[in-house]
Regions:
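Carbohydrate transferase catalytic cores enriched for Leloir-type hexosyltransferases
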Residues: 1-259
Length: 259
């Protein structure tokens, strides 16, 4: 059996969708039955340090488009041209790892699975520009029609898919995201103390990791501090946006700097 994957995020995204894609493919590489081949279809080679996290082997290799020398041609290949390569390579099943499927794949007779991570652009369109929400919505509805099975990463996402896409719940499977093996590593007490000192961490704290932007609502976590014991603090890790200033203003206005 040959399974194809949309590998754009594998080679381009260092966090989020990229981590999900790399971890899933890496895990499958170890457990698929003998004779199963994994093909990772990417419009370009992306970043070496990300691509290198997925090791090519006898049952896994990357596939790139031929004669696509411009960004537009590579984008068009991923949107539609890839289907011809999937047919030529004899792919039996294609997994859209990040909520998209190429045009015409159902007509080509290739079975499909798609993972949908969230529908924030439909639940909260105010966080996106107008044209992006229209493009994302079109892709979402098209994907729901084309996919044989849909993977939702949470029960909440499943409800949103049913609500906005009118999808039969029997077509949706909830499969939670995996966790990278790097988080299983136990650091030495010396290393832990070094990090504790470097970042002046309190004894008890909650960690919030992710871009500090409005749709991730870290301000709500800050506001909840008064409901927790005084000795519990919050440590926020991530790339700041102007929204981070709102959280800082709330902290200062409510004398929470020590937490």
């Amino acid at each position: 059996m040959i399974i194809g994957f949309d590998a754009k995020r594998i080679v381009r995204n260092a966090s989020g969708l990229g981590n999900y894609s790399r971890t899933l493919v890496g895990d499958l590489q170890r457990i698929v039955p003998e004779g199963t081949q994994l093909r990772l279809y990417s419009p370009d080679m992306g970043r070496d340090e990300l691509r290198g996290q997925v090791k090519e082997s006898s049952n896994l290799r990357f596939v790139y488009p031929h004669d696509c020398y411009t960004k537009l041609s590579r984008d068009l290949w991923r949107m539609k041209g890839i289907v011809e390569d999937l047919k030529k390579d004899g792919v039996h099943l294609y997994h859209g790892l990040t909520g998209e499927l190429p045009l015409g794949i159902r007509k080509a007779g290739i079975k499909t699975v798609v993972t949908i991570h969230d529908l924030i652009f439909m639940c909260h369109p105010e966080y996106y520009n107008w044209i992006d929400t229209k493009i994302y919505a079109w892709k979402f509805h098209k994907t729901c029609r084309e996919a044989d099975r849909i993977i939702a990463i949470s029960e909440c996402t499943k409800r949103d898919i049913m609500r906005f896409g009118g999808v039969d719940p029997s077509k949706i499977d909830v499969i939670y995201q995996s966790c990278s093996t790097e988080f299983k590593t136990r650091e030495s007490e010396k290393k832990l103390q070094q990090v504790h000192t470097k970042y002046m961490l309190p004894e008890r704290y909650i960690v919030n990791v992710g871009t500090i932007e409005e749709r991730k609502n870290v301000l709500l976590a800050v506001r909840a501090l008064h409901m927790l014991p005084e000795e519990v603090s919050i440590v926020i890790v991530g790339r700041p946006t102007p929204y981070a200033d709102k959280a800082k203003e709330y902290v200062e206005a409510n004398n929470l700097q020590h937490r």
